[in-house]
Amino acid sequence: MEKSNRRKRPSTPHLSCELCRERKIKCDKVDPCTNCVSAGVVCVPVHRPRLPRGVHARRARPMSPAFVPARAPTPVAGPVSSEEKQADASSGAVGAVDDDLRKRIHRLEAVVNSMRAAMQDPSPAPVSQVSCAYRCIVGGADEEQSVFNNSYPAPTSSLACSSSIPIHVQEQPPFTSHPDCFWTSLVGEVGNVAWANLDWRWDANCFPWVVDQIEDHGGDVGSSSETKSDTHSPLAPNMSKIGDGGLRFLGLSGNNPTLTWTPVLEDKEMTRQLCQIYLQQVDPIIKILHRPTVEKWMLHGERYLDYPERHVAVDALRSAICYAAAASLTDDQCSAIFQRSRSSGIVEDSRRACEAALERSGLLVSPSITGLQAFVLYLIARRSEDRSQAAWTLTAVAVRLAKALGLHRERDETFFSQQMRRRLWLTISLMDLQASFSQASEPLINTEEATSTFCLPQHINDSDMDPTMTHEIPDREGLCDTTFALVTYHIQLAGRALNFGTAASPQHKASQQQHAQRFEQNALRLLHFCDPESSPYAWFTWHGTQCLVSGARLSALRPLQLPQPSNSSSQPPPSPSPSPQEHNHELLRLALNVLEKAHLMHTDPRGEGFRWYVTMPWHALAVAITECSLCPDVARIQSAWPTIEACYQLLRLKGVAGQEEAIQRPLERLMCRARDKASPLLQLARHSPTFSLGSSAATSAAPTPRSRASSAPSDTLSDLSWPTAFSHAHSQLGVDLAPVGPVQPLAKLDLDSLLLQFDIESQPLLAGQIHPVDAEPSLRTWEQLMSDIDHAESNKLLP
């Protein structure tokens, strides 16, 4: 009898740890095991009875262990055979397994209850009330290893949820927070229940990502590395892919587990408002979504395309739209719409929710066009509000995913799919170029590839097509939903050729002129019938195109990366060249046009809705500072310096997107030298209230330069730097492309007269050969600046 009791209550064995089971390697079953120590990961030991095998294995259990009635003991009437003893021992082991499974289910229920309570009560719990689950979330390595041997109930953020957690758990001492251990513990709980072959679809609302995971391969069950995959499943990909990193290695997961779990944007009214903001302030610039489809989906509650209701790609896209909208808000807009400041966390919460949704979508392992659209919106929004290199780094992921989906290849598809694919690919190409400028680095998509894959979408409105359309639609004349987007698609192609040349041959210089002229012609052709006073969007499109034209011409003279000069034997016959003084004056004029337009979009009320996308053009600012410091004309310096000073202060305030020190430090030294050289020429203007030569105050204290940017449509179209970010203009929320004031009929613009002003071939500056490097001090100064930026970037990699 004593032996039978011992047989029924065996000691819980120490099985292979989680990582060894997943990797299918032998575990030495120490705590921690040698394999986990060598791999540098947290060892998660497994303590449970061994599963029955062979004829005694019970793979399918029709009832939950919590509802299996207890079996009455069978009286022993005579001698017990060996078969009966073996069956008795097997039933005892199964009973112990049932008890362990029941406890684990109870702990999972406590996890869900505590999280629901945390969503309802945002007040944080006192540190003394935090449950034992956070013991694995915190502490050092030794503490984590010891805690992993225990059970992991859920964290609680309020006293109200403590009642749902076992008493022995509440009494555990707390630890401080550590990023992702809690989710590791929760995954461990679910993984250890998997051997029971339970179907988690019944509780998909609580665990939408735990589905199609249950595969019993015998032995240490739950160690299967092969899981089911269904790209059209409304639920997320398998948990093993998310648990072992997913997008976390890209830095997308937040450090706060509550934020990564809590659906921040569950408020339908808030989501609706953010969608309206997106349609007004983001969609006119970033044309990767179909506006009518988004309106039907997020504003009217219809399904998105043919996706099921809970598809993770659709959830990721919804979160990305809300994040992009929140990032586009100014402080005044945020206060007026949500009655809270922008710094109160609306952008941060939206970003964390978007990151969590992207992680659940399994973008890296099962990419889709919808998921990639969400990722692109995330990168654009993050670049606008984050000065780190994250957006520049993650742009490479977007490029790879786009190529994996074949977005750069033409194929047989419907007209709607073709248009959306082309828009997405060209937007990613534009992001790649913008990221290269922010880091002063080479783009991932080179000029040859960008040219060979360049297929423009149609110049139409989104309302002209729908997902069921099969026939093509001709281009429209006049301002369309895609006008500014098409301008940026043209500039991303010209920008690569203008700034990342490979040779300084005469053929290269001639092609530089051709690229700049071709872009000007294409851009101006898109502006037929465009009245800049008809709407904020038209205002921005007009002035934005001016800025891009000036920026393209500036890049033809001062590319971001200068080509290496060729040997003397290949030099062409000498041709008339402008003097260095004339050259400097033209460079200064173009750079000032760029800066004035950028400053205008940061200050004019009509640009408020698109200001989030505008970054100060450091490339044009560096050229202007260099040329102004070498210019002997006092009147020209006095006219240019207020613009330079105001833009420099704005750059210091806003920062350079993606690279703060590597560009700003050399630029600051260049600015100091320019101030020292220009100050003797500006003694009379030093005390003028118009500007302050040595001011280092914020932008509000900086001078407001005289702007030529707000003039009539007959102005010269040469005022915006394509190397900077671009922006549209919606003046106020709630006015969707509405006229700002009374609009008079505008006749068709005289395109020939506008193009005549930009006839590059008629200008000796661009028609002639660029002056030799040794004869031009400004070029040497520019080369020194680019060398300093490259040196600063290299030093960032050193310890």
Swiss-Prot record:
<keyword id="KW-0539">Nucleus</keyword>
<feature type="region of interest" description="Disordered">
    <location>
        <begin position="67"/>
        <end position="95"/>
    </location>
</feature>
<dbReference type="GO" id="GO:0006351">
    <property type="term" value="P:DNA-templated transcription"/>
</dbReference>
<keyword id="KW-0862">Zinc</keyword>
<feature type="region of interest" description="Disordered">
    <location>
        <begin position="561"/>
        <end position="583"/>
    </location>
</feature>
<keyword id="KW-0238">DNA-binding</keyword>
<dbReference type="GO" id="GO:0008270">
    <property type="term" value="F:zinc ion binding"/>
</dbReference>
<dbReference type="InterPro" id="IPR036864">
    <property type="entry name" value="Zn2-C6_fun-type_DNA-bd_sf"/>
</dbReference>
<keyword id="KW-0805">Transcription regulation</keyword>
<feature type="region of interest" description="Disordered">
    <location>
        <begin position="218"/>
        <end position="237"/>
    </location>
</feature>
<dbReference type="GO" id="GO:0000981">
    <property type="term" value="F:DNA-binding transcription factor activity, RNA polymerase II-specific"/>
</dbReference>
<feature type="compositionally biased region" description="Low complexity">
    <location>
        <begin position="561"/>
        <end position="570"/>
    </location>
</feature>
<dbReference type="GO" id="GO:0003677">
    <property type="term" value="F:DNA binding"/>
</dbReference>
<feature type="DNA-binding region" description="Zn(2)-C6 fungal-type">
    <location>
        <begin position="17"/>
        <end position="43"/>
    </location>
</feature>
<dbReference type="Pfam" id="PF00172">
    <property type="entry name" value="Zn_clus"/>
</dbReference>
<comment type="function">
    <text>Transcription factor that specifically regulates the neosartoricin biosynthesis gene cluster.</text>
</comment>
<dbReference type="Pfam" id="PF04082">
    <property type="entry name" value="Fungal_trans"/>
</dbReference>
<feature type="region of interest" description="Disordered">
    <location>
        <begin position="692"/>
        <end position="716"/>
    </location>
</feature>
<dbReference type="GO" id="GO:0005634">
    <property type="term" value="C:nucleus"/>
</dbReference>
<keyword id="KW-0479">Metal-binding</keyword>
<keyword id="KW-0804">Transcription</keyword>
<feature type="compositionally biased region" description="Low complexity">
    <location>
        <begin position="695"/>
        <end position="714"/>
    </location>
</feature>
<dbReference type="InterPro" id="IPR050613">
    <property type="entry name" value="Sec_Metabolite_Reg"/>
</dbReference>
<dbReference type="InterPro" id="IPR001138">
    <property type="entry name" value="Zn2Cys6_DnaBD"/>
</dbReference>
<protein>
    <recommendedName>
        <fullName>C6 finger domain transcription factor nscR</fullName>
    </recommendedName>
</protein>
<dbReference type="InterPro" id="IPR007219">
    <property type="entry name" value="Transcription_factor_dom_fun"/>
</dbReference>
